[in-house]
Amino acid sequence: MRSFILKTCAFFKESQVETANVQRQLLRHTLATMAYRSAKSVRDAPESFGSFSSGDKGRTPAQILAHMGDLMDWGLSIAKGAQAWHDSTPLPWSQEVERYFAAVKAFDDYLAGDGPLAASPEKLFQGPIADALNHTGQINMLRRMAGCPVRSENYYRADISAGCVGADQSKPGREF
């Protein structure tokens, strides 16, 4: 009986580890999806786009991208168990783009490692990741309003894979 119990406990522990790995991989794929979409959002945008104003009280694209970078830094700090929020002052557009993708990479690198997650994958997704993904759409909308629209794409066909989180992404599968 003792042997059966030990084997059962080992199975469940292994099953829990497997589930945790699947969840981490899904988070990493979500970051890669966000990186793909946001790379498309910022690609070929003129430097002046960062300060574009829609005329209302909304944020500029540079302010949104700075916030997205802050969200990635925050997500990493939550994952490491030392939650810290910083409200960054936006850099010039091209520098802000670099900062954002560096923050996404740092978060992804941590998720790719074997360090413990101090928060559940669900909380990491529903907080910083989902928020940043939402802001990607805002940048797309502002691109159209600024007269430099982003072409639509069938994202289902996009070549997206975990770990590919930089500004250099694969070519679109099908734009329209």
Spell out what each predicted region is:
Residues 43-49, 106-110:
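Extracellular-facing binding/remodeling surfaces
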Residues 113-116:
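Surface-exposed, polar/charged faces of alpha-helical domains
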Residues 82-110:
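Helix-adjacent hinge/juxtasegments
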Residues 12, 18, 24, 28-42, ...:
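Short, contiguous alpha-helical
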